[in-house]
Swiss-Prot record:
InterPro entries: BAGE-like
Expression tissues: Not expressed in normal tissues except in testis. Expressed in melanoma, bladder and lung carcinomas.
Gene: BAGE5
Family, per entry: Belongs to the BAGE family.
Primary site of residence: secreted
Native source organism of the sequence: Homo sapiens (Human)
Protein name, entry field: B melanoma antigen 5
One Gene Ontology cellular component: extracellular region
UniProt miscellaneous comment: The ancestral BAGE gene was generated by juxtacentromeric reshuffling of the KMT2C/MLL3 gene. The BAGE family was expanded by juxtacentromeric movement and/or acrocentric exchanges. BAGE family is composed of expressed genes that map to the juxtacentromeric regions of chromosomes 13 and 21 and of unexpressed gene fragments that scattered in the juxtacentromeric regions of several chromosomes, including chromosomes 9, 13, 18 and 21.
Lineage: Eukaryota, Metazoa, Chordata, Craniata, Vertebrata
């Protein structure tokens, strides 16, 4: 379970890096949760 969480966190960072260049700041902000809970909703 922990490995899956780490994988999702890394995927979120990669998506964030792409979206910050291509999409609106709002979308990028949604992929940058301070406590990591938003990952459940994104994936």
């Amino acid at each position: 379970m922990a490995a899956g969480a780490v994988f999702l966190a890394l995927s979120a960072q990669l998506l964030q890096a792409r979206l910050m260049k291509e999409e609106s700041p709002v979308v990028s902000w949604r992929l940058e949760p301070e406590d990591g809970t938003a990952l459940c909703f994104i994936f």
